[in-house]
């Protein structure tokens, strides 16, 4: 499984619970550096390269009370996460 401090390439699709796609992004990140929301950081450490997981993230493990420019505050989200 992926280790803290390991650099990985991820593909992440973030959706509202109604299925509306909000963000589709590919990134290189370092696991455990808090570069991602808490829900993603926790799941990454349980995954292996090539795996895909579906995460249902409550707002407090996602973008919280502030949200982002495209994600409203207090949004519960579905995240499809792949380690490439």
Segment roles from a protein language model:
Residues 1-9:
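Short, glycine/small-residue-enriched coil/turn segments at secondary-structure junctions
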Residues 9-15:
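Beta-strand signatures of extracellular beta-sandwich domains
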Residues 16-79:
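A beta-strand/beta-hairpin structural motif
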Residues 80-84:
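Short beta-strand-to-coil "C-cap" segments at the C-terminal boundary of structured domains/repeats
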């Amino acid at each position: 499984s992926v280790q803290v401090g390991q650099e990985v390439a991820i593909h992440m699709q973030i959706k509202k619970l109604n299925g509306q796609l909000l963000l589709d992004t590919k990134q290189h990140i370092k696991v455990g550096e808090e570069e991602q929301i808490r829900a993603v950081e926790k799941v990454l450490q349980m995954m292996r390269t090539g795996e895909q997981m579906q995460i249902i993230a409550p707002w407090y493990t996602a973008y919280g009370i502030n949200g982002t420019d495209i994600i409203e505050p207090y949004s519960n989200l579905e995240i499809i996460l792949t380690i490439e």
